[in-house]
């Protein structure tokens, strides 16, 4: 959290909008999890307060309890292919994944789908131990136009923060995703 708090002002000064920052932090809810996300949300709010950025920011949700599953399955299909439209039927976790992760978060405004998918790749890469999901999200990134060279550049930028082992694992997963 300390490095994040230190770098956030520079990011805001160089084009990252407050909405993009908040959406990136919110995206972490479904990957590292709420417990790991909360300190970053608190740090974000503190930096925003120091910079006189008014809170709360305008809402970015686009789904309701009634349509979140449908919209989430549509987002999954756009990222991973049409076979994902029915994947939510394969168990309760799959249903939660479609409705919550993809329906509640991926459908929000403030970041576009390729940005969200790249951010998800970064969360999985930094977390470690998620290689099957990292391979899937490497493919998802490429399906959305974040080509292999771009993803390699993203891994390279993350290396000082996550270390060589996780960076090398991410490159290996990217290679598997392109086979």
List each model region and its residues.
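Short, charged low-complexity intrinsically disordered segments located at boundaries
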Residues: 20-26, 54-59, 150-154
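Short, structured motif recognition centered on aromatic/hydrophobic residues
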Residues: 4-8, 24-25, 115-125, 134, ...
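Short alpha-helix boundary/capping elements
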Residues: 1, 16, 32-33, 123-130, ...
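Acidic, glycine/proline-rich low-complexity segments that act as flexible tails and inter-domain linkers
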Residues: 2-13, 36-114, 135, 143, ...
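Substrate/cofactor-recognition hotspot
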Residues: 23, 27-35
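Helix N-cap / loop-to-helix initiation motif
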Residues: 16-19, 112, 145-149
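Short, glycine/charged-rich beta-strand-loop motifs at protein surfaces that mediate ligand recognition
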Residues: 109, 122-128, 141
């Amino acid at each position: 959290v300390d490095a994040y708090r230190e770098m956030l002002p520079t990011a805001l000064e160089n084009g990252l909008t407050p909405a993009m920052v908040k959406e990136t932090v919110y995206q972490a809810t479904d990957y590292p999890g709420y417990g790991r996300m909360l300190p970053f949300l608190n740090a974000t709010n503190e930096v925003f307060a120091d910079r006189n950025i008014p809170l709360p920011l305008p809402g970015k949700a686009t789904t309701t309890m009634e349509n979140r599953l449908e919209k989430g399955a549509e987002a999954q299909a756009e990222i991973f292919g049409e076979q994902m439209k029915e994947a939510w039927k394969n168990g309760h976790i799959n249903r939660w994944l479609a409705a919550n992760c993809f329906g509640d978060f991926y459908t929000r405004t403030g970041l576009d789908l390729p940005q969200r998918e790249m951010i998800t790749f970064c969360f999985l890469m930094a977390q470690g131990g998620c290689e099957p999901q990292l391979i899937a999200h490497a493919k998802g990134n490429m399906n959305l136009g974040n080509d292999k060279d771009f993803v390699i550049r993203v891994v390279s930028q993350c290396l000082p923060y996550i270390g060589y082992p996780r960076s090398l694992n991410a490159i290996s997963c990217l290679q598997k995703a392109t086979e």
